[in-house]
Swiss-Prot record:
Functional summary from the UniProt entry: Dephosphorylates the 5' and 2'(3')-phosphates of deoxyribonucleotides.
Species of provenance: Staphylococcus epidermidis (strain ATCC 35984 / DSM 28319 / BCRC 17069 / CCUG 31568 / BM 3577 / RP62A)
GO molecular function annotation: 5'-nucleotidase activity; metal ion binding
Active-site residue list: D9 (nucleophile), D11 (proton donor)
InterPro entries (alphabetical): 5'(3')-deoxyribonucleotidase (IPR010708), HAD-like_sf (IPR036412), HAD_sf (IPR023214)
Enzyme class: hydrolase
Residues that, per the record, bind Mg(2+): D9, D11, D135
Annotated protein name in UniProt: Putative 5'(3')-deoxyribonucleotidase
Upper classification of the organism: Bacteria, Bacillati, Bacillota, Bacilli, Bacillales
Length: 179
């Protein structure tokens, strides 16, 4: 029997990219942005005068290599990997300098995944999977399988997709559909 496929986004789903960006922006621009203040907003809209700084941070060698893993992501992805084919689909084209760091990060924190299942892409409509777990509504709306929105500060007002709020919710979602 063929196993179903789950494609999982990296930034803001497996990795706490926003937390690292906010920390770096606060330090370099002498700001005091709190994560709670971002609910329903994108960082670039809150501080348009620092959009260049944000892009500089994202382009720095090592930035994506040093991100924190989202709570419970490793254990849940490992469990899902026992029953599903797991693919990591990260929209790396926005920051092409991130490829190597993202690859090394995935090898370190998700060593049980097949590196041949790491997909560095732009638009995720190219991904042939049964499920996509992503925080970006634009990626979810073009995906042809079942779209699952992973809660992030910028998408809290989005209601078009089934939602999971953290990796324990992901585990519960897939446990509820297993036969």
């Amino acid at each position: 029997m063929t196993r179903q496929r789950i494609a999982i986004d990296m930034d803001e789903v497996l990795a706490d990219t926003l937390g690292a960006v906010v920390k770096a922006v606060n330090e370099r621009a002498d700001l005091n942005i709190k994560m709670e203040s971002l609910n329903g907003k994108k960082l670039k809209h809150m501080i348009p005068e620092h959009e260049g700084l944000v892009m500089d941070i994202l382009k720095e060698p090592g930035f994506f290599r040093n991100l924190d893993v989202m709570p419970h992501a490793q254990e849940v992805v490992k469990q899902l990997n026992e029953h599903y084919d797991i693919y990591i689909a990260t929209a790396a084209m926005d920051v092409p300098t991130s490829f190597h760091d993202k690859y090394e990060w995935l090898l370190e924190y998700f060593p049980f995944l097949d590196p041949q299942h790491f997909v560095f892409c732009g638009r995720k409509n190219i991904i042939l999977a049964d499920y996509l777990i992503d925080d970006n509504p634009k990626q979810l709306e073009i995906f042809e399988g079942k779209s699952i929105m992973f809660t992030a500060s910028h998408n809290v007002n989005e209601h078009r997709f089934e939602r999971v709020s953290g990796w324990r919710d992901v585990k519960n979602y897939f446990n509820s559909i297993e036969k």
